[in-house]
Amino acid sequence: MPSPCPYLKDRDSRMEYRYIDGCDFAVNDALARRGFRRFGKYFSKPNCAGCRECVNIRVDALNFKFNKSARRTMRKNENTKIILTKPLIDDAHVALYKKYHKFMQEKREWKYYELDFRRYYELYIAGHAEFGKEIAYFADGRLIGVDLVDILSDGISAVYCYYDPDFADLSIGRYSLYQQILLAQQLNLRWIYLGYYVKDCPSLAYKAHYKPYERLCEYVALDETPVWKKAE
């Protein structure tokens, strides 16, 4: 059934869902390359009649060049501690998630949903198997950012990132993407699967700034080969 579009006002959206209990590396890999996004054990992608504004993009990590702005962001975070681990859940994670979303409700008019431990587990811990990872960011021992990712055969899928708005000067959102790119380079994985780019949605339009990147050309079924093309 159609529901209000979360990205563009005055539009409806229709999502295609898959629930997979015990998803393995190969299945998650295939779904990500066909435009599905994973949250816990649920996989989804838009399938809206007459609208193709949600465009899946993947950044070419092995050919990405860090410009002056990127290097400046890296320097600002010289004292930021980074820990790569399996996805975790505790009071600090849930509190930071809520703080970030309340901030985005005020800044971008995001709809705020109350979230407890159970809901956080269902969205970000369940189903991570061997491919789900967490990149956690700390300042003076305090958790200030969480970047949840999936490791794929040819890249890294960006699942979700949230951070402490009190540390906005560190640009943790951008910094986390740069760290994904560096990790992909270390692992010799070419792509960062960034999810949906929507040119008229401020929360998603930024993704086109990270070049070079490719676009998933069109809706692709599970039994079809995905076609990605380099963006001009």
Region locations from a protein language model:
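Terminal substrate-recognition subdomain of acyl/acetyltransferases
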Residues: M1-K81, K86, R190-E232
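Short secondary-structure boundary micro-motifs
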Residues: S3-C5, S13, R118-Y121, G132, ...
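A structural signal for well-ordered alpha-helical segments within the folded catalytic domains
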Residues: F25, D91, R174-Y178
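Short polybasic/polar patches that bind polyanions
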Residues: A32, K102, Q185
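A conserved beta-strand-loop-helix scaffold within acyl/acetyltransferase catalytic domains
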Residues: Y42-G50, V59-D169, H209
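Aromatic (often tryptophan-rich) hydrophobic motifs at membrane interfaces
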Residues: I135-Y219
